[in-house]
From Swiss-Prot:
Quaternary context: Interacts with MinD and FtsZ.
Protein's recorded name: Probable septum site-determining protein MinC
Signal peptide: none
Stored NCBIfam families: minC
Alphabetized Pfam families for the sequence: MinC_C, MinC_N
UniProt similarity note: Belongs to the MinC family.
Keyword list, A-Z: Cell cycle, Cell division, Septation
Amino acid sequence: MIILDINQNYKYFMFNKVCLKFKIKNFNILVIYLYDIKEKNIYKTIKNKIKNFSYFFKKMPCIINIKYLSEEDQYFWKYFHKKLSNLGLCIIGVSGCNNKIWEKIITRNGLLIFKEQINKKIFYEKKNKITKINNNYIIDKPIRSGQTIYAKKKNLIIMNTVNSGAEVIADGDIHIYGIMRGRASAGASKDTKSQIFCTKLYAEFISIAGKNWINENVLNSYLGKPVRFYIKNDILTIQKFSL
């Protein structure tokens, strides 16, 4: 027998043992913005992107934003969605639906519709809950593909390379004194003052307090250079620095 306790935990009545919990969590989700699905080369472009960054796209959930598509594009959606699915993208839903016709088309495909509106009050309250950073977590070995390192309540300092397919996370700042090819997420506790520093930038993914960049967002002039990432005016910003 299972009962619901006042803490929203389900327990076995006889053994008083927790068997499941309900929690609200925030996750990073890739959003693909579409502007014209009639374009002949769009499939080739997406396919090449997946091939070049296979570690990034592998099992990564994504949302398709159709805000900029025309009414004419509605007739091509079913075919386009099928082609995208065949490329291996894990599409969980669609955002940017601006009329009921689009909503009907999307729901027929069995996809969820995500609203783009943000509850500013809730966001503000969460933003104030900053985790206190107590110390530094230092690693002098390379971070291999498939590894995930999390520096809880700490700054993370890596004195080596972060390989493609690896992920480093910290509640505070991240310093990488080597080649950065993987994924880095600083300010995991929503601290917008957190920063990321690396001496050679080739990252697949960069995030600070939920503000994200992927590799294609980075101009070529910054690749391979010493840079820092920080948030300015609520925007994730990149800046070169001298060693």
